[in-house]
Amino acid sequence: MESLMIIILAIILIICVFAIFYATIYNKFQDYIIRINEVEAMIDTNLRNKYDLYNKVIPIIKGSNKDKTKEKEKEPEIFSEIVKLRSRKIGNFELYRILGRADAELIKLENEIKGLDKNEDIKKIKEQIEEINLKIDNATQYYNDNITIYNTLLKKFPSNLIAACCKYKEKLFFDRKDMSDEDYDDFKL
């Protein structure tokens, strides 16, 4: 009778230890999932704000370039990717790339169109874009750091057992490079 009680207590103790262990690792996963979701929302908001700023820049550039017919002919090409986005749905990383190309295009236009770099509205918008770029860079670094830890938890024992029970999947870095596949074409610059 006494040995039966000891066995029952041992089983209860093992179950309790396992439950505490499971809850601890589960909560660790949840912590990183929440961090990742929050920073994704921050990146999304900043990308949308940057996109809106580029939509404000387009009419300003067109307005400051009215007299120049040579540049006027190029206007349909100015920020054409930004204009096309109005009718498309894309992911954050693709938007990030398009907006990065728009940054380069804005610098190029400032060099090509005389007086554009002196326009106060353009200066203000450029400052806001630079501020947003810093926020996005910091957020993507934080995102990738958390993804690294999350993916490490998925791979290491014993947290990989909890991940398998909860059906957690590996997440990609912000640049969408999948380090675990054989596809080398996803390493775009």
Identify the residue ranges that each predicted region occupies.
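A helix-centric hydrophobic-segment signal that preferentially recognizes long
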Residues: E2-L189
